[in-house]
Amino acid sequence: DPGQVSLSLMNVVLFIIPLVSIVFGTMFFYNSREFMELLLSQPISRVALFLGLYLGLTLPLSAVYLIGVGIPFMYHAGIMTGGYWILLLVGVSLTWVFTALAFFIAVLSEQRVKGIGMTIVLWLFFAILYDGIILFILFALEEYPLEKLTLILSLFNPIDLGRILMLLQFDIAALMGYTGALFSKFYGNMFGSAVAVLALWTWVATPVWLGYRAFSRKDF
């Protein structure tokens, strides 16, 4: 069943793609430092260099993901369902988000070990700790109406947004969790998906912009 395959791949995508993107992105930036210093001595704008490095990494990573996940599924399942397209969209989006976060951290931190450590901690925060913090808040303040607060908090975690997008597409209430059910209740599946996609790509634009701002002021 294509739907079951998509759901099985969901957990792999939500955990492995962000980890690979953020760690590989950080290592790529540090390893390209001498190359960046050489190019900055030429008449090349910093915005062109930064975006060139970013796109030069995210596009191949996205292509590898699309080829590795898309071709086998098309071969075995034929025509892809809507849920599978969402799976591809979420994987590509998370690649762009966490590569942008990796670049931002690598620009801020001069030390390679410190930078890689920060990226791993950030991944752990989004993948595991963030949901635990939300559950603690809900448990501690269970007497208060926290639906809107929970919706707002869910927008600040790109991994949660990807999970919500997938589960809204399949409309599986038992697997949606608290935030997914709230998205479906308050926004409906279609509008909720649109809100999640917009928030996810805001997560791409914001760290890219912050990373460029820091990169443009950095003294190499």
Describe each PLM feature range.
Residues 1-16, 55-119:
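Secretory targeting signals
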Residues 6-32:
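Long, hydrophobic alpha-helical segments
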Residues 21-25, 34-35, 101, 121, ...:
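Hydrophobic/aromatic residues in alpha-helical transmembrane segments
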Residues 27-58:
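Helix-loop-helix units of permease transmembrane domains in multi-pass membrane transporters
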Residues 56, 90, 122-126, 199, ...:
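Transmembrane alpha-helical core residues of multi-pass small-molecule transporters
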Residues 101-147:
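Cytoplasmic juxtamembrane interface segments
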Residues 130-205, 209-213:
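Terminal transmembrane helical anchor/hairpin motif
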Residues 214-220:
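Short cytosolic juxtamembrane segments of multi-pass membrane proteins
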